[in-house]
């Protein structure tokens, strides 16, 4: 059964998860004991730390990336542990990002990943038999599974089964039971807000004699006797179920107790529940994130405090292998999850959901309170919020207040299309990014003026900002017309090798000092679409989170040297960038092979384990490979090439036709339809040193 408000409930649940993560993350390090949190912050009623932008977190990475097994492998059947294991290998960069790389035999996820790389398939990769009970029963079994509950609404058994399949990649025993419990609880929350019923639905999907069930029952029994004192219950957990009894870095059982504690003492209040989960210590971001998903779904958007929601502003970042996927718009993702939910339930999907195109940006502001991460450059003059007063289409739009502006005063209203290290306070989980907007694409939006004061109408000018130079490329100014919708559309100009990190409008007053401009504009149907055509000039790039912008590197040592990207590696390595969903395009790379036999260009790469690679391949040879969890040579021919000589290598994918040209000469053409979309990049199949001077990408 799919509830009528399914998309909105998913939206609330996913917001809730990320609110919990953001609230709990600052006090997650073990130095933050329960007592220290209480003595420092007392009763927590809001975020304890402000961020420019909240960096990536493993608790968000896993639910997002591992669910992609439903797109890649389990397209028309139920999920298996091996499907999810393939997502682990495909979307992770080894040793960085995604999850905690704490060492084999220390970090459960690191251990499972190495097992998978060594050919130990799931579920053996996460089993007690393989890794021992302590490693297998750490908390990760339940912290990467929220989305499996979100795509299986009102079906706790199926949600639990999917969650178990996903968790078995890395966990076993009680660790898997945590996945079953939370997926079932999330699923149940779609049909009831009664927290007791939700908890019981979770417990119904695990053995009653399990430790997980026992700690949950101990908390519920304590609550019956002491319903108003969560701190007394926390003391009971410390005494009877603490880390001294359940060892490892972060065992699931004590934290399961905190999760049930926060839900039962929170009594259906979203804010209070995530606050209690944070105040209780131990794995604060994991616990607050899990219960945040449950309570977000149960309470809906109206139950989430604006002081928690506003700083997120509908945007989060990830740290998988795709810099494009790492920039996530929550309302858009809620719709994507809903489409999966309808598919899994074998129920026809509402046509309006299917209108979304993965390779484009489309913000319709239809979900209540949605802002799609639109920002203003000057909050003194302008403020954004969701509105239902005006809408070009549907019922919602973005309202931008402009407050007493005079001639020459302005504020930018923009979508943040790309990030660098300077946009963050820290380097949590080392995210990397590829822009969401490129030269050649079209930007369009509808704008309505509701001006209350001033002696001249407001003016706007579309613009994009260049990420390295911070230079605005401003298009022509035009006057708005009061109480009318106007179309604003422009083609993003050639950025001459730079990346774009802002797309929007400059809102400027033309009023004299008295009376000042006061009023609102409404923005609706914000879109970025069409074929991109751009270059990457490495003179205009930077190192960000250890990567050359806009790439995500996997293995090898990468750097910027004299205006070029340079790799030195003793093993196979690759680097990816671009629109993850790009279909037909060419990528031309000017490279200089300096040592080694393999110097390739990637196209339609869907991760570390999927895609095409073509280029210089051994002495006097060029080849085309398909990577499908292992490289298979599709075609090759003789081509005399030399080290320390520059080559222009162009690879084109057009339908099923793949073409390799070097210095303008077509050398290979082959038909293959394994991969229809994906990123571009560069790679090597072995030890090599290569210098890359320029890339040109042209979508067909």
Language-model segment annotations:
Residues 31, 312, 316, 320, ...:
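Solvent-exposed, flexible loop/coil residues
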Residues 362, 372, 380, 479-482, ...:
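Extracellular glycan-recognition regions
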Residues 467-501, 639-646:
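Extracellular carbohydrate recognition and processing domains
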